[in-house]
Amino acid sequence: MITIARTASRLALALSLAALPAAALAQDAKDAPKWDVAAPPGVKIREVPLNVEEGTWMNLDISPDGQTIAFDLLGDIYTMPISGGTPTRIGEGLPYETQPRFSPDGKRIAFTSDRGGGDNIWIMNRDGSDKRQLTNESFRLMNQPSWSPDGKYIVAKKHFTTQRSLGTGEVWLYHVSGGDGVLLVKRPSEAHQKELGEPIFAPDGKSIYFTRNTTPGPIFQYAQDSNNQVFAIERYELDSGKTEHVIGGEGGAVRPTPSPDGKKMAYVRREATQSRLYIRDLATGTDRKVFDALDMDSQETWAVTGVYPNMAWTPDSASVVVWAGGKLNRVDVATGKSSVIPFRVTDSRGVIDPPLPRVAVAPDSFETKMPRSATVSPDGKQVVFETLGKLWIKPMAGGDARRLTADEAAMEAYPSWSADGKRIAYVRWTDADLGEVRVIGATGGKSTVLATAGHYKRPVFSPDGKIVVFEKDAGGYLTSPRGSVEPGIYRVPSTGGTSVKITVNATRPQFGAANDRVFVMEGDAKESRLVSLDLNGEARRIHAKGELVNDYRVSPDGQYLAFRQNYQAFVVPLMPGSQEVNLSHKGGALPVTKASGDGADWIHWS
């Protein structure tokens, strides 16, 4: 038995867009307490004592006068004398704060913090006072700040994700007084998944060093061969805008750290399974290995915040201080001799205990957690949805759900009601026979096959119920490559017959009020378009477009348009004719009403 009452009903009600009074549609959580990373409302913070003489993945920097070292440890920032001792915590609390960098005058420290809700670049005084946010990214990740020699600018990495959740970086320049920043080193494409980061100013301020994954192609792969060149150090010239290769070769080169006198470059190279500290003479191109005992860098894996932690030169360009083996190690670059800078941190960390639900391993009945494709019947009395690979119908007023079919041999998905509420179109799937588009009565019984042996999605009835339109996709990745010829949007009589292709390179077919025009979605992950065509794929019109919009839903009367942007559902009037409108949840040419509270999936009109 499958208990589904609460989850399915809530999902259908939350995602059904009924008539349009703003108060009924938009239930924003305006009265909820504002979220504060440093003091989250409604949670209990427990202090855990800390007494350590070493740390993991510690970023560090040395003050311009050479007297003070700053470092991060478990998300807090400390300063202490360069000789070692008891550190002073200058950045603390629940926000995770890392990568401290002294300003050229030594009075301020730039750092990375999620204090504002996401990783951004912040600036504080040397003693930790007057923290202020420099960058204001709400979607991208910012990290790895570095000051210009005149103290007027900060260069940092901005991280971009892709459809795979992996991504790459760009190098951006920010004035310390604020602003949106200036792009210096652009990613090769929006689909690029190879890392770029670790920016740092040259001592003369004329160029910026950074690291780039130089392996062929745009797609990231795990377990790359670090014996060859995975990463290389490059230089961006501010005057010309040109980029040139600086250091690479076998074992790669990461974490570029130029000496204050501009004559040398400290960097990390891999030798077999061991990361080593090297020094490059920038005049002659000669490399010397000066320290063997680094921890493993992250060349083969993912390095959003850097391939190795920040290290720093002493002001006389004679020594490099680098984290390794849990310690802060001072390495004399002339002799290769190293010594540990001792420290002991005795304080605490605030932690919030996670929820600990009790989960029965194998109950006789259970509540499904992921009902999908919930669609309310035209009369508003029932909802059909898919869970555990089967289609179910449930009264909107509550009560038990029932199976729509008695088919135990196949998976079922993408249910859609006819306008009269008497039939449901859906997709049936088996690995052996592939997919079929079918129509069945809302009370169950025998189904009619409309399309066979293919990869199908989202069948939808025309308003008069005479036509079903659907997507035909291509397999070959996780599914069989069979049945993949001529993908596109098709139409077929709802009683059966020959399928006719309407268009290609489109998805999510649907109707508005008319039987002779089909709406589809075109575009890519960044920007999509709502387009309509006649049943022969002609008389094309663009109605709307929007960045990061991944779903459009035209109301049955053709008067309104629901769209999904940034995981939320919004509603706007649908302009008649071929008036192209730019959509944004922030508003614009048309009034926008938010229709969801805490996210929206499978939006549809009742």
Residue spans for each PLM region:
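Conserved beta-strand position repeated across blades of beta-propeller domains
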Residues: D61, R101, S146, I200, ...
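A flexible loop/linker signature enriched in serine peptidases of the S9 family
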Residues: Q27-D28, E53-E54, D72-Y78, G91-E97, ...
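Bacterial N-terminal signal peptides that target proteins for export
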Residues: I2-A12
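Glycine/alanine-rich phosphate-binding loops at beta-alpha junctions
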Residues: N59, S63, P87
